[in-house]
């Protein structure tokens, strides 16, 4: 007996115009927020607002806001700190968590997974750390301004990649990969500097608390717990332990990021098979025009679970946190730290002018000089070679963009200087240097892209001729 053909699908009802417009608006917004240059623009806007606010007649409200006490407690245990502390020491832990996961991914499958691939960005990053530090120390020979030697060693990934994105597809993809690898190695060095140079006297009792948090994370991973929410409490314990030790608590984020698995969890059944079965089940149950929720709830739950298990945890968590870091954590950090009162910075006393000038010169000149010169030396000695489609002009572009220190440089400045005047001068230097480096980098990028167009056109013509 022949089987009857399946019934035709019910006719689709036209959506209300308001719903169509809303869906288009949200789709455009989602696409807009995933453009790399946008996060840099938001960060720049936050810094601009902070700078204007701190130099306006309402400047007292700016400083009063960040010194507002905020308390968290459980039972008799109470932690009370300023809003500035919670942003710099707690919220920035999420930023460092993403940094740790980026490092973990690069070590597993990226530019740091292969010694030959990582040799050039490692050499470039080494030059981009040592030369700026030496330039700063050459200008600032006395204490306490010498303590700011690490301020110009960092690179702001979001800003640098955002400026590069403004240049469009005319820049080879390998230039972007080179910049990302260099910036990630810069982050590793910055984390080591924070851990070694800017952690106070260690309280070893705190290591027991931090160790408890790490053991809890390992235990959850061992039994196969995949949901990220389960790791919030162990992460908080690790953060409290790092705070108690005297090390900077944001290092807890790096530790957690480096511990995030890079492979999908072990399951009894392949997630793809589960997803296919759930889709077939969903199609079989959803025959009515408006299927009952209880009929489709189970296959939808299976599909959602399979979708989650298909991605490695390091990618899944990074994708979930990226918009929060790009559009909340980093702009809040910029808003809380970029507000330098220009009238309040006395550049005539206490070496403040030297600190500011040292930061500017080290970032704008030292960064590209160190990156290009050490890269050239490493290639000349045969230790590594330039990636495909990357010329020395491209290396110069990377060096110029690496001079955008911004977020990480300001963060290190807040750790390096206790003197308010020196801290203000260093922050002002970072802001000036980042603006100058971005402007020069963008200008050089347009020149570099224009010079590549004739060769790209010749390559397209030769490809077309070969196909004919």
From Swiss-Prot:
Membrane topology: Multi-pass membrane protein
Transmembrane segments: 32-52, 83-103, 119-139, 148-168, 178-198, 205-225, 320-340, 354-374, 397-417, 428-448
UniProtKB keywords: Antiport, Cell inner membrane, Cell membrane, Ion transport, Membrane, Sodium, Sodium transport, Transmembrane, Transmembrane helix, Transport
A single cellular component GO annotation: plasma membrane
Localization in the cell: Cell inner membrane
Keyword presence, Zinc: no
Gene3D superfamilies on file: Na+/H+ antiporter like domain
Catalysed reaction, written as an equation: Na(+)(in) + 2 H(+)(out) = Na(+)(out) + 2 H(+)(in)
Main location: membrane
A single MF term (Gene Ontology): sodium:proton antiporter activity
Superkingdom of the source species: Bacteria
Example GO BP: regulation of pH
InterPro entries xref list: Na/H_antiporter_dom_sf (IPR023171), NhaA (IPR004670)
Entry similarity comment: Belongs to the NhaA Na(+)/H(+) (TC 2.A.33) antiporter family.
Described function: Na(+)/H(+) antiporter that extrudes sodium in exchange for external protons.
Protein name according to UniProt: Na(+)/H(+) antiporter NhaA
